[in-house]
Amino acid sequence: SSVMIDGSHLSLDENIVLTQKVVEAAHDVGVSVEAELGRLGGIEDNISVDEKDAMYTDPTEARKFVDETNVDYLAIAIGTAHGKYKGIPKLDFDRLDTIKKDLNMPIVLHGASGVDNDSIKKAISLGVNKINIDTELRCAYTDKIREIFAEKPDLFDLRKYIGPARENVKAKVIEKIRLFGSNGKA
């Protein structure tokens, strides 16, 4: 199937070396590789990246990275962030368009939870092939549990809140499948 390597916290050259090793090992056993280039703001895996330290993916570096790593999918930084947004994300669509046209390969949008629907649709129209929305799904789950506990604070039977929380995630997934134009596709 596939694996994801995130060396975006490294220098370009270090990220290339790390990603090359992962690609070589994965491709040897028929597994594709997604890699991240550029740094997203926010928090992921307990690593915090301040907005001032977030760096958009440089199109020239993207070309070098792909040429030297032979990665199968590239996650680029164009203004999204891991975790919940404090403001409204503004995506750099010109950067996305430039990178997609130059690389002509699957492009991934990490940190897309909370990005407005119009921006998601535009990103898809410009060639984004995969969109990560983990935070949005986690929030759908925990928001439902919070709602249930607010109504029934003494509830202790997890069967009474896990099922509804899962259904809330399911509804969010269905909504996103439709938004992404993925319904009916395998």
Please annotate each region the language model reported.
Residues 146-186:
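Extended, intrinsically disordered, low-complexity segments
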